[in-house]
Structures are given as structure tokens and as C-alpha cells.
Design a protein with these regions (language model features):
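Cytosolic juxtamembrane N-terminal segment immediately preceding the first transmembrane helix
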Residues: 2-54
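Extracytoplasmic gate region of multi-pass secondary transporters
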Residues: 60, 249-303
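Helix-breaking motifs and short loop linkers at transmembrane-helix boundaries and internal kinks
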Residues: 71, 103, 124-130, 317, ...
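Central cavity-lining transmembrane alpha-helices of secondary-active solute carriers
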Residues: 82-95, 296-308
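Conserved MFS/SLC helix-loop-helix module at the cytosolic interface between two early adjacent transmembrane helices
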Residues: 90-126
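Cytoplasmic membrane-interface "Motif A"-like loop-to-helix N-cap segments
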Residues: 101-111, 315-326
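C-terminal ends and interior cores of transmembrane alpha-helices
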Residues: 113-126, 327-341
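Helix-loop-helix hairpin linking two adjacent transmembrane segments in secondary transporters
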Residues: 169-216
């Protein structure tokens, strides 16, 4: 059964008015403007990305228990993240091509099923090597879900509201993270660590429930699907690396600088997402409950940061929003990692702005990358640049793991600030796209 309904124009309710009628700029105007089909697509992408986040954080939250169970050093534990992110680049690029060739919803289903199956498999791993392989295979689905879900929603959203809409989708990452932190606190408080980490992975079966609903209720945006079907070129890697000519602009420059931007932002983000739980438990000597409590502040900041960043990217523009929060994120990392021993209240309070800034920078990513590419190669371009950046950014958590043996986790965390500097520089080679319509 096709996941794309017959092509038809979107109604006035499904697009922000552009014919002189007042636009709906209320708090939830962006959601009303999506229309019924768009809201179902939003729900599917929100749920998929939130559960993607939940499955991802089962590992960082269980890292201390895993290291003790398998007798791992910091470098080996950091390798988990690097392998996941590197393989996710392959998965994301392939999912982007798949989305351009067979449709957004079908590709979304493949990614969700993949990461759910291999997350559960991680819970049965008998040794470090097997767990590393399963975690890598999980990355195939993990890499593709965001790119495909973001494109699906972006093609329903109007240019006026696209930043806020995609920022709201991004906020589901914080929801999944919070859910993982709650489950972690409960499971590790009630069950011995040697079994608790396995239970965390087994709960990763939750996304399977989402697949049934998405398969029945969510469809590709009609106008974008029609444009994709008419295009002679679908999902072409050659197209996104084609240099410009005097008569036609190419996409090579966009692809290179967008990949560099993604590298910087994700290098900084995954440094924090991977190592902050370990930092709190090992260097700040917090209990399981204490670590969960401190993470609550950071995750709350992240959730609000996603929503606020989405609003600001529509107000300020895509580039200004990213540049602003790249600077603030770098400052927050340095401040957080250098909090004096014993200043636990300050550590708690600073978790909020750290989570806020490191997430607000992501809010414009979904809309910005989607707007940089034409419909026929949007999935390929967004999937490739976002996930290549994820693979290259994966070097950061591993580097922190090796540096932690001599610098301590807190000192090594500062390395993540370099990523945000790279992101700010990459913006120099990219255009502003706020207000660009997608067809």
C-alpha cells in the first residue's frame, strides 16, 4: 500500500497564508498551519526521534556499569560512541537516498525498525566485541531517522513557521533523553548493575509500537511527493557534489560547508551527551539518584532550548541563531567543566543553560539543511551532510575518552568547545535560507 496519497494542493489551513490573509502567529500557529496530514507527520517524526533519543542514551547512562562488567578503560568506552556515530553516517546517507527514491514515510519505517531491533540485541551481548557490533548496527537506523523525519515535516511546514516546527520536532530528543534518565534511575536503583544495563537495552523495543501507527496514518507531503516523482534525478550523490557553472549553480560548496557545520555542532554535542553522566558519577561522586537529578536540570534546559531555538531561527535567521548558540555553548562547556569541587549547587544550576544552549543550536538544523537542497536530492543532501558531520564529530567523544585518562573527564570535556568554533567558521561558506519555500 502506498504511503503517499494522490497529489493535490495543500489547503489554506495546511499552509501559512501568503495571499494577504493574516498569518497565524499564535503560540501554536505553526501546529495549526500544518493541517491534519501535517500534524500526523509531525507526531510520527516527533515519536520516532524521541524514541531514537531514548535508545541512544541507554548506552551513555549505562556506561559506568558496562565498563565495570566488561573491564573497560575510558578509551574503550569512548569507542562505543565513535562506532555508533560513524556507522550512523552510513545509515543516514543511505536513508536519505532511500527517502528520495521510495518516499519519506517508507524510509522512516525502515530506520525505526532497524534501531529498535539492534538496541534490544545489545541487551543480549555476551562480551564487549559483540556489544560493539550490535551498537554499530543500531547506528544504521539511528543515523537515518532524524534526516528522514525532519524532511517529512519540513515539506509540510510553511516557510514562515518552519524553524519553530522543526525545533518542536527536535525537542523530542530531550523528551526521549528524559525518559531514559527516569528509567535509568528506577532500574539501577532496584536491580543489580550487572543486569540493569541489559534491562535498559531491552526497553528499547518501545519504537516497534510507533511503527504500526506510522504505517497506517502518516503520508508524504503531496506536493513534495509529486515533485519528487516528476524529477529525472532522485537520490543522486553525484548531484550534491556537482560544482557550479556559469549557467547553473551547483551543490558542491553547500555540501562541503554544511558537512563541516554539522561536524562542529555534533562534535560538541556528543562530547557532552556521552560524557556528562560519567563525569557526574565518577568525578563529582554523585549517586545514581543524584546523577539523574542533575541530568534533569540539563535535560529541562535542553527541551526549552529546542523550542526557543526554533522560534529564534525564524526570528533571527538560520545563520544568526546557529552562530549565537555556538558561542554560548562553548562558553557554557568551559564554565561547567571548571566548577570547583564541592560547588554542587552551582553544578546543578549551570546544567540548565548548558542544556539550553547545546540544544538551541540544533533547532534550526532541520529547516536549514532542508532549505539548502532541492526536492529531488533533499533527502540525499540532508542525510549525507548531517550524518557525515556526525561521523566526523564522533572523533570528539573518543578523543575525550583517551584524554580523560590523563586530564580527567572534566578537563577533557573542554575539548568539545572546539567543535562549536568549527561550526561558527563553517557558516561563512553557506547562504541564509529563511523564508525559502519548499516544493
Amino acid at each position: 500500500m502506498s504511503t503517499t496519497p494522490p497529489p493535490q494542493s495543500l489547503t489554506g489551513d495546511e499552509r501559512t497564508a501568503t495571499d494577504g490573509r493574516p498569518a497565524d502567529d499564535g503560540a501554536f500557529g505553526w501546529l495549526r498551519a500544518l493541517g491534519p496530514r501535517g500534524r500526523r507527520a509531525f507526531a510520527g517524526a516527533f515519536g520516532g526521534y524521541g524514541l531514537d533519543s531514548y535508545d541512544y542514551f541507554t548506552l551513555p547512562l549505562s556506561m559506568v556499569a558496562l565498563a565495570a562488567y566488561f573491564g573497560l578503560d575510558s578509551g574503550q568506552t569512548g569507542l562505543f560512541t565513535t562506532v555508533t556515530l560513524v556507522v550512523s553516517a552510513v545509515g543516514g546517507a543511505l536513508a536519505g537516498v532511500l527517502a528520495d527514491r521510495v518516499g519519506r514515510v517508507r524510509a522512516l519505517l525502515v530506520t525505526v525498525i532497524t534501531y529498535a531491533v539492534f538496541t534490544v540485541a545489545c541487551g543480549f551481548a555476551p562480551n564487549y566485541e559483540t556489544l560493539l557490533v550490535f551498537r554499530a548496527l543500531q547506528g544504521l537506523g539511528f543515523g537515518g531517522e532524524w534526516a528522514v523525519g525532519a524532511i517529512l515535516v519540513a515539506e509540510y511546514a510553511s516557510a514562515r513557521h518552519r524553524g519553530r516546527t522543526l525545533g518542536a520536532v527536535q525537542s523530542s530528543w530531550a523528551v526521549g533523553w528524559a525518559l531514559a534518565a527516569v528509567v535509568y534511575t528506577v532500574v539501577f536503583s532496584l536491580v543489580d548493575d550487572d543486569l540493569a544495563w541489559r534491562i535498559m537495552f531491552w526497553t528499547g523495543a518501545l519504537p516497534a509500537l510507533l511503527v504500526v501507527w506510522v504505517r497506517r496514518r502518516v503520508h508524504d507531503a503531496p506536493e513534495a511527493a509529486a515533485a519528487r516523482e516528476k524529477s529525472a534525478v532522485k537520490g543522486s550523490f553525484a548531484a550534491i557534489f556537482r560544482p557550479g557553472t556559469a549557467g547553473a549553480p551547483g551543490l558542491l560548496r553547500v555540501t562541503l560547508f554544511a558537512g563541516l557545520l554539522s561536524t562542529g555542532v555534533q562534535g560538541g554535542y556528543y562530547t557532552l551527551a556521552t560524557w556528562v553522566p560519567t563525569y557526574l558519577k565518577t568525578e563529582r561522586d554523585l549517586s545514581v539518584v543524584g546523577t539523574g537529578g542533575y541530568l534533569t536540570f540539563l535535560i529541562s534546559g535542553a527541551f526549552i532550548g529546542y523550542l526557543t531555538g526554533g522560534w529564534l531561527t525564524d526570528l533571527l535567521g538560520r545563520k544568526r541563531n546557529i552562530r549565537l548558540f555556538a558561542l554560548l555553548s562553548a562558553v557554557c562547556i568551559v564554565a561547567y567543566a571548571n566548577i570547583p569541587s564541592g560547588a554542587d549547587t552551582l553544578l546543578l544550576v549551570l546544567g540548565f543553560p548548558l542544556g539550553f544552549c547545546m540544544s538551541a543550536i540544533f533547532s534550526g538544523f532541520g529547516s536549514y539543511l532542508a532549505e539548502l537542497y532541492p526536492t529531488a536530492v533533499r533527502g540525499t543532501g540532508q542525510g549525507f551532510t548531517y550524518n557525515t558531520g556526525r561521523a566526523m564529530g564522533a572523533v570528539f567523544p573518543t578523543t575525550v575518552g583517551f584524554l580523560a585518562d590523563s586530564w580527567g573527564v572534566g578537563g577533557a570535556l573542554v575539548f568539545g568547545a572546539i567543535g562549536y568554533g568549527i561550526a561558527a567558521l563553517a557558516l561563512l561558506g553557506l547562504p541564509e535560507t529563511r523564508g525559502r519555500e519548499l516544493a
